[in-house]
Amino acid sequence: YIVILYFTQSFSFGAYQIRIATALYALAYLFPFLVLPLGLANFISNMLFGGFGIVDMAGGCIVGILAAACIVLIRRKNWSRVLIAVPIILVPGLGVATYLSYFLSMPYPLMAVNLCIGQMIPSIVGVILVKALEKGIYPGRTAGITGKRSTEH
């Protein structure tokens, strides 16, 4: 997460951002133990590259944990993998906007829309990443958390 953010930091911060690193939240679908590390990675990234201090570090950490936890819930409920995109878009889009709108003197609805639009690319990348890794981990089939065979592709 931190390395990807380092290389994409020119368009990963501010009112208009595409934070490609958030695609990695999708990995929590396959590896639920990543929920806390992804939040911590967001904290460290915002500490190293962000400009809004402790609020951004804590907010990013919370957003990362919530998004990854929602993705784990999607797997536990055995819902479609496509739904992985929803928390990758909405949790950062609506959550980060709560404090960025204040720091950037921008109305919350406008900030939230901007961030949600910017999260669409990482959400698509995240879904594709999970599907590709799943094929490598479970060749010839897709498996849910219970290991039951699924016909969803």
Model-based region annotation:
Residues Y1, L40-N46:
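Small-polar-interrupted transmembrane alpha-helices in polytopic inner-membrane proteins
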Residues Y1-L36:
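Hydrophobic transmembrane alpha-helices
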Residues Q9-Q17, I44-H153:
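Membrane-embedded alpha-helical hairpins and interfacial helices in multi-pass inner-membrane proteins
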Residues L27-L38, L73-L83:
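Membrane-helix interface "capping/anchor" motifs
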